[in-house]
């Protein structure tokens, strides 16, 4: 479905799928849990899911003759780290807006982890006190205008690379990649579990798996704590992406499966249950998840498995999207492990 779109390679290639034997057994052994390791997808500043999206956005940035990538996220945004990394790799400047999306007060929160890496890679990082919102932000639009006023040529990439005309394409490719891996494995996954916030990862998967009738087998775990806005954004991105790739099927609201039970108490703030999920996965599989995204989707996967959401014998693919550098901003929460 993606043959007609330009792609700038930023990743190693297909990401590995591994069976989480010990976690599956710990949760009763009735469900086979696998992980697709998007967190291991590149040598660019620890990688992660945003690179798969950016592979289809960067050709447009280069064609526009831009000299500066301009993007936005929270203080510990994985996305802005990846924008800084890609800018360094392709020889562009980088302007980042880091908003106060998370009510978290670790003493070094704005000096370690993702934001530190962005600074090391040369990005112009600006902290802004505005709160969480997955939509288009005034501070980002202002940054774009400031780059222009200084004589630069900005290329605007929204939060999560999501509300961008090509934002959903990368995860259509994820679905196509999984189908090829399923052919090698000799079975198909019954469910795909993914964390959902700005929406284009989920939306791209939804479109990609709609091609073989599995759109509603993509189970989004909300991490935004604003689920109505998130669900609407997933639907909008999916519908736009379906048109772009000429899916030939309509995407409707019921195709967006979003479970809202695990985002509490706020975006970016881990509950005790999220922290326990992070510890459990680390101690059983040495697979590191973060407090903002993957810890919450892992909490959801664990709880849904224990509740019997997945039928006995189901094969569940957990999409590990990355994000471990953010753990550095939560050192006090994990000071005892």
UniProtKB/Swiss-Prot annotation:
**What's the catalysed reaction?**
1-aminocyclopropane-1-carboxylate + H2O = 2-oxobutanoate + NH4(+)
E.C. numbers: 3.5.99.7
CDD domains tied to this protein: ACCD
State the top-level EC class. hydrolase
Listed A to Z, the keywords are: Hydrolase, Pyridoxal phosphate
| One GO MF term | D-cysteine desulfhydrase activity
Q: Which residues carry this modification: N6-(pyridoxal phosphate)lysine?
A: 50
Per its UniProt record, the required cofactor names are: pyridoxal 5'-phosphate
By its UniProt entry, which Pfam families does this protein fall under? PALP
**Gene Ontology biological-process entries:** 1-aminocyclopropane-1-carboxylate metabolic process; amine catabolic process
Segments passing through the bilayer: none
InterPro entries the record matches? ACCD_DCysDesulf, ACP_carboxylate_deaminase, ACP_carboxylate_deaminase_bac, TrpB-like_PALP, TrpB-like_PALP_sf
| Record-annotated active site | 77
Question: Its biological function?
Answer: Catalyzes a cyclopropane ring-opening reaction, the irreversible conversion of 1-aminocyclopropane-1-carboxylate (ACC) to ammonia and alpha-ketobutyrate. Allows growth on ACC as a nitrogen source.
PANTHER family per the record? 1-AMINOCYCLOPROPANE-1-CARBOXYLATE DEAMINASE-RELATED
Q: What family, per the record?
A: Belongs to the ACC deaminase/D-cysteine desulfhydrase family.
Quaternary state and partners of this protein?
Homotrimer.
What is the name attached to this protein's record? 1-aminocyclopropane-1-carboxylate deaminase
Q: Which organism is it from?
A: Bradyrhizobium diazoefficiens (strain JCM 10833 / BCRC 13528 / IAM 13628 / NBRC 14792 / USDA 110)
Gene name in the database record: acdS
